Amino acid sequence: MLSRYDAFQSEAGKQVATYVELDELLAKSDFIFLHCPLFPSTEGIINKDNIAKMKDGVVIINNSRGPLVVEQDLYDALESGKVSAAAVDVVSTEPIKADNVLLKAKNCIITPHISWAAQASRQRIMDITVDNIKAFLDGNTVNRVNK
């Protein structure tokens, strides 16, 4: 079963997964993927209190914003085995500093904020750029924001 927690539920979201409360999501999930903006309400959402509510052996993946995770709390959970593994494409301070505690965790994969950079994504960016330049040279505007 695919579950999701979102403060802003939508009909489209209901087509993809079942909405549940955060505590239920934390308690039942084998994998927790963070795909959310950084708001005051989401900052530090992965912290020692919420980690304690998770299943033993959970895997946490953060592709969103570094400050969603309290890095020391995640490190402690990785070291204790509460969290079996983590993968983060973002950290609280970028570029990552040499003293970031997650660099010491053997069961944590860290990538340099490149999860968006799949070949298809990069190709789409190049195609849009070429189309925008062609339109400009032809005297047309595309995606004009100051109109």
Predicted regions and their residues:
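C-terminal helix-to-coil terminal segments
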Residues: 92-147
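Rossmann-like adenosine-cofactor binding region
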Residues: 7-101
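Short, hydrophobic secondary-structure boundary micro-motifs
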Residues: 5, 86-87, 143-147
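Short alpha-helical segments used as structural interaction elements across diverse proteins
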Residues: 1, 62, 119-121
